[in-house]
Each structure stands twice: as C-alpha cells, then as structure tokens.
Regions:
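Catalytic core of tubulin tyrosine ligase-like
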Residues: 128-129, 139-143, 150, 154-299
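Conserved N-terminal catalytic core of the sugar/cofactor nucleotidyltransferase
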Residues: 10-127
Length: 308
C-alpha cells in the first residue's frame, strides 16, 4: 500500500514536462503502475493533502482521470494542522477569527490517515506493509519488489531507501544505528568530525542519505500510533495579520512551527533496513528554488545518466 505527502500547494500538480505535459502526480502514479502491472493487482493508494490544497488536488486528479489508476483504490485524507507562534510566543492569526495553521510535519501522516478510518480499512483488506514517500521525487520506485522483498526477508520492522551522498556536506539525513535502535541523524545535527569520519576502508561512515521513501509494517505502525511523537520547533516564514487587520508576508523567518517528523517513527521501530538505490536513476527531488534540486537544474554530465 502507498501513501503520498503533498506538502506544498499544487506541488503534485506541477507540470515538469519539456516537450509535452508531464505532471509530478503523473510520474508517481506511472511508477506505481509498473508494480500494479507486474503484480496483476491494484494497490491501495492513500494521498495526503493539506486543508489548503485538498480541493485542488482531488479536482485535478479527477479531471485527469487519475492518470489511468483505478479510482476505487485511491483514497484522500487531510493532514492535521498545528498553530504557529511568533518569537514572543504569541499565536499568529491568518484572519481576524482564524489562527494561522500549518501542516504538522511529515511525521503526522499515519495519525492523520487513522483519523479518516483508513487503518480499519487496511486491516480489513489484509494490508501488512505500507510505503510512505514524498511527493517531490519523480524518479523514485514505489513498492519496488526488490526493496519490499529485502525488508521482509531481513525480518526488520521497516526499511528506508538511501543514496550515497553527492558530497560529505549534502543536506540529507543519514540512516544509522543509535543505542541499538534505528536512527536518522539530520544534517544540521552532524558535527564537522562526524561529516568527515571514515571507516577502516577509507569510506565516509555517515555516507548514506535518506530520500523519504520508507516501508513500514502496518502492525508496528498501529502499535506506535497511540504514542505521542516529539515536537520539533522549526523557524519559518509565516504570513499573518496584526491587531489592525494589516496583512504581513515576511521575507525572513518570523515564527516557530511545531512539527512531528517521520524520523521519530523510524526510531520507534525495533530495527530498520537501509536499502541503497542509484541516485542517478531514482533520486530527482523537485523542491529547491535554485541549485542541485531545483526544477531548472541541468546535469553537467555530457550524457543523460538517467536513461534506463
């Protein structure tokens, strides 16, 4: 089974085609369709939206006839929202009678899914494993049989796809073991010594970054669903109105958001299998305004390495 996160308004609806229309949702659905055709069975597909993009997302996919996917197996749900506060601890308002609310982080997907009753639906359907993936990586393989098989064969509670870092300072979290538990160390938590630490073979020790494509045992997700995930405080630019009703759209961070993170769900598992994939074939996130992951980025390679 699959769950997708559409964190930014209209992100999945973005047209990334060069010579023809090609939408991010279309790419992801095509990737799932590969497995559907091989398996000869439809896979339940759960798509998470925010309050702000729910109507746009559902209307867009309906208009596009779900890019050929069986509509009976596509289920939408809204992510839970959390308030923001300014640096003085004051709640920010979006309207005179409405708090400024934001999605509660990428760790909120399973609790949000359960609020819609989809946990019971999965139990009745006999779904044993659930893939959680981000909307922005258009090349990722979803429910890749090799990945699924490796995780099941390992006996682990979950698995995470990883890629070798492009360079030691790449801003990605690293899947490792901490006190016998699976742990993801975020790039901003790593010291310079950790970043450049090498093993006995001269390879970087913290060299495999997660790409936000995880496979979880559903019964383990159910077991941790009652536990509260820790809240992470994140500084963000949050539009708001002041006491006079004047709208403000800050250009620099002005507030704290409180988010749960999927990395804490991984930490709650007994074990996790890191599964390396080829970043040139399976990792193309579209998220940064400029730089390596931006939409207009072109590879310096003289040939297209991403050809299959």
């Amino acid at each position: 089974s699959s769950a997708a996160s559409d964190v930014y308004k209209r992100q999945g609806m973005y047209n990334i085609g060069v010579t023809r229309e090609l939408y991010i949702f279309e790419c992801l659905i095509n990737n799932v369709m590969e497995i559907v055709k091989k398996a000869g069975a439809w896979i339940p597909f759960y798509i998470m939206t925010s309050d702000k993009n729910y109507d746009d997302t559902t209307a867009f996919l309906k208009e596009k006839n779900y890019f050929g996917y069986n509509a009976e197996y596509i289920h939408f749900f809204k992510q839970e929202m959390a308030p923001s506060v300014d640096y003085n601890g004051k709640l920010l308002m979006e309207a005179p009678d409405h708090l400024s609310l934001s999605p509660n982080g990428n760790g909120g997907w399973f609790s949000s899914l359960c609020r819609y009753g989809y946990d019971k639906q999965m139990k009745e359907a006999g779904v044993e494993w659930l893939t959680a993936f981000a909307v922005d990586n258009v090349l990722q393989r979803i429910n890749d049989p090799a990945f699924v098989g490796a995780v099941i064969d390992s006996g682990c509670d979950c698995g995470g796809m990883v890629v070798r870092k492009a360079d030691p300072n790449e801003r990605v979290g690293v899947l490792c073991t901490e006190d016998g538990k699976p742990s993801i160390v975020e790039y901003y938590e790593m010291t310079d010594d950790m970043i450049h630490l090498k093993d006995e073979n001269g390879n970087l020790l913290y060299n495999f970054g997660v790409i936000l494509n995880y496979l979880f045992r559903v019964d383990k997700l159910m077991a941790i669903a009652e536990k509260s995930l820790p809240l992470h405080v994140v500084e963000k630019k949050v539009p708001y109105i002041d006491e006079n009703g004047t709208e403000h759209k800050p250009e620099t961070p002005n507030a704290y958001k409180f988010e749960t993170l999927i990395l804490d769900m991984v930490y709650m598992m007994d074990n996790s299998l890191p599964f390396e994939v080829d970043r040139e074939k399976e990792f193309a996130p579209v998220k940064n305004a400029t730089g390596t992951d931006c939409l207009l980025y072109t590879s310096p390679s003289p040939r297209d390495k991403r050809q299959s």
